[in-house]
Amino acid sequence: ISAKMHGGVPEDYLEIHNFFDSSKAALPDVRHRAILHSSFGIFVAEKVFGVTVTNSEGKKVSVRDLCEEHVIQDLGFIPTPERWFKNMPIEPWMSGSKKKL
């Protein structure tokens, strides 16, 4: 889809799309999306890949646009991390109360 929208070939954008879906290695179901499929994940991807990528046609393409399109394609909108985690119970270990020194 990125190549159809922005030109070039799919391989021009594969590294970015693979980055978003890399969390499947840790959590191989739809919950993997909670890790990067959010406004914060898009911010992180822009830090990793830069503001633009240059496709094989020499055209500069916004990384933010590519990432937003990926998340919208998967979820229909761009959630915030707060939206992902608002119903997640807070466990005692999350505050470091179970640290072993």
What does each of the following model-derived ranges do?
Residues 1-101:
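N-terminal membrane-targeting hydrophobic helices
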